Amino acid sequence: MSTETWNLFVAWAQFLLLLRMLPQCDSAKPCPSVCRCDAGFIYCNDRDLTSIPSGIPDDATTLYLQNNQINNAGIPSDLKGLDKVERIYLYRNSLDEFPINLPKNVKELHLQENNIRTITYDALLQIPFIEELHLDDNSVSAVSIEDGAFRDNIFLRLLFLSRNHLSTIPWGLPKTIEELRLDDNRISTISEISLQDLTNLKRLVLDGNLLNNNGLGERVFMNLINLTELSLVRNSLTSPPANLPGTSLRKLYLQENHMNYVPPNSFADLTQLYRLDMSNNNLTALPQGIFDDLDNLTQLFLRNNPWYCGCKMKWVRDWLQSLPSKVNVRGLMCQAPERVRGMTIKDLNKELFDCKDRIGSNTIHVTTTMLNSLLPAQGQWPVPVTKQPEIRPPDINKIFRTTPIPVKKIITIQVKSITTETIYISWKVALPMTALRLSWQLGHSPVFGSITETIVTGDRAEYLLTALEPESPYRICMVPMETGNIYLSDETPVCIETETAPLKMYNPTTTLNREQEKEPYKNSSLPLAAIIGGAVALVAITLLALVCWYVHRNGSLFSRNCAYNKGRRRKDDYAEAGTKKDNSILEIRETSFPMIPINSDPLSKEEFIIHTIFPPNGVSLYKNSHSESSSNRSYRDSGIPDSDHSHS
């Protein structure tokens, strides 16, 4: 083959290859000018668009259209041709109906925070492969959803309808749904058939609705065999719902309801449950054995319930003490009776539960004589003595008269004000006890003012109150927290009144240092005055000596022949005194005094007479360059007039 033939063949092949590539170039669409495109991701969000721009590339997979003003009319029909689009974000727009003209292969659609009111079967039929549908924060009501609108969306797994206007659960939901969120709606009733087909449902959220026990069907949750999480927070339930699914349920949220009673079998067969929350209800007691079937329970939250720690709750303490360390229980704190308020149930000993024995007619209490001698010395608890058939019951009245109970204060309190903000409290107890409640209140009145209280253990005998108001009265009270001791049945508090120290006596932070600082000044007031007086006298004597020396030398206090030159400077010269910022000033009287500049520059010869004026009472007439003065004379730092600014 010749060279020319070969070159012709190569050129022809290149031409055919170019023709083959031309259709591809024509089919590739550029990115819309208002958007940004990046490998299938089309970003048209936050641009105040009222419609979806045309010309979106065919290879687009995800459309970001949120935070615009797109309405239903702004969705073009050519959007249906984008077969590769699987995710569309259209939240925070102006849609009032479920949009149409969407790509048929979309799997994830975000429509939350619009104003969508109606959902039709035809609109959902256009997206048959939808898996996640987010319709939160719209205006969807039960009547605005067409019956069976979702029935052919057989791939739908997540349906979010939170914060809408639903009064019932939509009918005809597909069996494929795994997560259903209906929180913050107006649902008041759920019939047994509403959820019976949702056998694949794993998470059901019904928070913030109007549900009560009568509005829930008796078997409404029984068919949810794969349900792992059920949330009924912020409803109006008075007890846990019946017939909960026990095969898979792992999380149960019942907080913020009106529950005041828990039936004994409420949690039967919930063997997989590991988290249970019944906080913020009105529960006062729990039936014994309520948690026996919860083999996997590791998190139990019972906060903010008015627990009454009576005899019926003693089993809870025993159960808590037998739990392994992996089980986390929170919120079992006594609110009543008053003697144990603020104490955790787990820390109570058995005597505090007030479980008095139910003694029949053949049992009497013979404790007065025996325990009066034993209890104060040995600290033993009163015990009932059972009557024997052959023993005649003793005369109780006679026993009280022969061995009266000694009247003695059970608690003796002593207080001492330490600083303006602290009070030291100490006390003595006549009988052994487990705990005491200490309270303090600003003011003497037990009615007005907020009360602060704390629980102190029985082995303590002192306490320090801090962060108090200075110079303020306080009422401090203590009351024993016992029930098993017959001498402590009276819960009347023992109170004492005191005041914090005044501010003039104490400094809350540096009191000791301040007192140490005051001592030197108390002893140094006299020497300091003597030093000042001596200095004043010395200055006065020096000035007087200078005047006498001047008069003695010149024969007169005012001389016209006195020369002010640099060669005559001595320590007692007025020029030297001027450099020491003497309190005298120089007044120019006549032009007969020669001025000699310090920098030896020639000046115009002028003669001056300098007269020294002493201000009365030692008042300084010296003015620096920063003080206000009407004089036209400026001063250097040494106090001598600046020769460049002197005037006659």
Curated annotation (Swiss-Prot):
Listed Gene3D superfamilies: Ribonuclease Inhibitor (3.80.10.10)
GO cellular component: axon terminus; axonal growth cone; endoplasmic reticulum membrane; extracellular space; focal adhesion; growth cone membrane; plasma membrane; synaptic membrane
PTM entry text: N-glycosylated. Proteolytic cleavage in the juxtamembrane region gives rise to a soluble ectodomain. Cleavage is probably effected by a metalloprotease.
Subcellular location per the Swiss-Prot or TrEMBL entry: Cell membrane; Endoplasmic reticulum membrane; Cell junction, Focal adhesion; Secreted
Biased composition (Low complexity): 624-633
PROSITE patterns: FN3
SUPFAM superfamilies (UniProt xref): Fibronectin type III, L domain-like
Pfam families noted in UniProt: LRR_8
Membrane topology recorded in Swiss-Prot or TrEMBL: Single-pass membrane protein
Segments on the Extracellular side according to the record's topology features: 29-527
Cytoplasmic-facing ranges: 549-648
Residue span(s) of domain LRRCT: 305-356
GO biological process: cell-cell adhesion via plasma-membrane adhesion molecules; embryonic morphogenesis; fibroblast growth factor receptor signaling pathway; head development; heart development; neuron projection development; neuron projection extension; proepicardium cell migration involved in pericardium morphogenesis
Ranges for region Disordered: 624-648
UniProt KW keywords: Cell adhesion, Cell junction, Cell membrane, Cell projection, Developmental protein, Disulfide bond, Endoplasmic reticulum, Glycoprotein, Leucine-rich repeat, Membrane, Repeat, Secreted, Signal, Transmembrane, Transmembrane helix
GO molecular function, one term: identical protein binding
Known function: Functions in cell-cell adhesion, cell migration and axon guidance, exerting an attractive or repulsive role depending on its interaction partners. Modulates cadherin-dependent cell-cell adhesion and cell sorting. Plays a role in the spatial organization of brain neurons. Plays a role in vascular development. Plays a role in cell-cell adhesion via its interaction with latrophilins that are expressed at the surface of adjacent cells. Mediates axon attraction towards cells expressing ntn1.
Complex and partners: Interacts with fgfr1 and fgfr4. Interacts with rnd1, cdh1 and pcdh8. Interacts (via extracellular domain) with unc5b and unc5d (via extracellular domain).
Name of this chain's protein: Leucine-rich repeat transmembrane protein FLRT3
Organism, scientific name: Xenopus laevis (African clawed frog)
Gene, per the UniProt record: flrt3
